[in-house]
């Protein structure tokens, strides 16, 4: 595998100041502080189960609410993946995974196609997980999809506990991203598309 599939992104607005480092071919090492504890917990899942090395620091207007920071971290992380993958030569492109967590079961299927689309099927009954607004789960994935150019389908198959459902979702997402971004040696570094390119339309 290439040792150069790394990227650093810095994104600063009037609402947030975010820096991200990613190593696609990492070991699941993470240093994460967004100021939103539950989001940190989910980002650790992406690193741990995707085997991506992640360093994420975010300062945002969380004194208002978590929306801007949550969304902007999704945007910046999507940009970091895009930059690290480059032309996406040799990758599997597609990924899928079923992740259980106790009674919850979530399926994620995705395509690193350059065509941003989100189909979101989580049914979360609790309005909050700790202090985290559960509506922000969808907002995070919308932001990530639009900035990374992936097609992402999230389907909840079973589940009652909102924490279990969301954590299963992030675990399934991380394993799907791992599968999609891994190198297919049979491709010999070619782009996995009949049109010869994968870019955000």
From Swiss-Prot:
What PROSITE patterns does the record point to? IGP_DEHYDRATASE_1, IGP_DEHYDRATASE_2
Does the keyword section mention Nucleotide-binding? no
Q: Enumerate the subcellular locations listed in this protein's record, separating them with semicolons.
A: Cytoplasm
UniProt keyword terms in alphabetical order: Amino-acid biosynthesis, Cytoplasm, Histidine biosynthesis, Lyase
- Pathway linked to the protein: Amino-acid biosynthesis; L-histidine biosynthesis; L-histidine from 5-phospho-alpha-D-ribose 1-diphosphate: step 6/9
User: GO molecular function terms here?
Assistant: imidazoleglycerol-phosphate dehydratase activity
Catalysed reaction per UniProt? D-erythro-1-(imidazol-4-yl)glycerol 3-phosphate = 3-(imidazol-4-yl)-2-oxopropyl phosphate + H2O
Give any single GO term for biological process.
L-histidine biosynthetic process
Q: Name one GO cellular component term.
A: cytoplasm
Say where the protein is mainly found: cytoplasm
Gene3D superfamilies named in the record: Imidazole glycerol phosphate dehydratase, domain 1 (3.30.230.40)
Q: Does the keyword Transferase apply?
A: no
What EC number is given for this enzyme?
A: 4.2.1.19
Q: Which Pfam families match?
A: IGPD (PF00475)
Which PANTHER family does its entry note?
IMIDAZOLEGLYCEROL-PHOSPHATE DEHYDRATASE, IMIDAZOLEGLYCEROL-PHOSPHATE DEHYDRATASE HIS7
* Entry similarity comment: Belongs to the imidazoleglycerol-phosphate dehydratase family.
Q: What is this protein's name?
A: Imidazoleglycerol-phosphate dehydratase
Which organism does this record belong to?
Prochlorococcus marinus (strain MIT 9515)
Question: Corresponding gene?
Answer: hisB
């Amino acid at each position: 595998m290439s040792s150069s599939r790394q990227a650093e992104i810095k994104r600063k607005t009037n609402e947030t100041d975010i820096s991200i480092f990613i190593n696609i071919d990492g070991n699941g090492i993470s240093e994460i502080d967004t100021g939103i504890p539950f989001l940190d917990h989910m980002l650790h899942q992406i690193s741990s189960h995707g085997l991506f090395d992640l360093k994420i620091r975010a300062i945002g207007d969380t004194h208002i609410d978590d929306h801007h920071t949550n969304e902007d971290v999704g945007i910046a992380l999507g940009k970091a993946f895009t930059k690290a993958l480059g032309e996406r030569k040799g990758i599997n492109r597609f990924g899928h995974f079923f992740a259980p967590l106790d009674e919850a079961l979530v399926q994620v299927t995705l395509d690193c196609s350059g065509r941003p689309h989100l189909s979101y099927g989580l049914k979360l009954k609790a309005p909050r997980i700790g202090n985290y607004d559960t509506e922000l789960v969808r907002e995070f994935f919308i932001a990530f999809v639009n900035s990374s150019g992936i097609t992402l389908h999230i389907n909840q198959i079973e589940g009652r506990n909102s924490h279990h459902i969301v954590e299963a979702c992030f675990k399934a997402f991380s394993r799907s991203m791992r599968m999609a971004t891994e190198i297919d040696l049979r491709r010999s570094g070619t782009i996995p598309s009949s049109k010869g390119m994968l870019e955000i339309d």
